[in-house]
Amino acid sequence: LYSSAASDVYKRQAYYVYAYAKLYKNGAIAKDEKINVVVPTGNFGNILAAFYAKNMGLPIAKLICASNENKVLYDFFSTGTYDRNRDFILTSSPSMDILISSNLERLIYRIAGNDAEKNTKMMEELSTDGKYAITDEMRAQLADFYGNYTSEEETAKTIKKLYEDTGYIIDTHTAVAAGVYDKYKKDTGDTETKTVIASTCLLYTSPSPRDKRQS
């Protein structure tokens, strides 16, 4: 699902409820124990669904936003400025090759205090100037998010390492998430919280960058 329709975002909350219930059923977590969620994303739909699920009461600690080299979301969480004025990079995780993250608007609306006028102004700035900046007050509401990205080289190394360690081949999008999770652990020291890494793309369904150039 790559739609920006609100109904699709709402449906995706079930992924995280199911994952939490599965962990609890298998005895991996205790009742009400918080987990982290790592989501590889460009359009912000799946991680927004996790955010909604958290706000509805699902025990989620950190929402870890994983980007590829089109790291507009990482830069947003790092600086508070969303800026699409940059080169577009074709990567091996093409479903994340996005510079205008359409579902982020819904998060902006929430942290703007459900202020439609303020939200509209920022989206108009994005349309005309290619960027907008949120206020410090709005940034403070993003404390539950962590953002980072992986390069193409790092993504390939993650796939290789996981295959050598487990015999399991992950797709490039999931590898981005796994690589970012490693960075999260190093940056925060949080190695104890149980963590779900969302796999949002099938291994054999996405075209390579070369395929995209030829299409």
Where are these regions (language model features)?
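Single conserved hydrophobic/aromatic residue that forms the stacking wall/gate
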Residues: 1-6, 10, 204-215
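A glycine-rich, Thr/Ser-enriched phosphate-binding loop motif common to dinucleotide/cofactor-binding enzymes
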Residues: 7-14, 99
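General beta-strand structural signal in soluble alpha/beta enzymes
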Residues: 11, 39, 65-66, 168-172, ...
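Active-site-adjacent helical/loop segments in soluble small-molecule enzymes
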Residues: 11-26, 31-34, 110-188
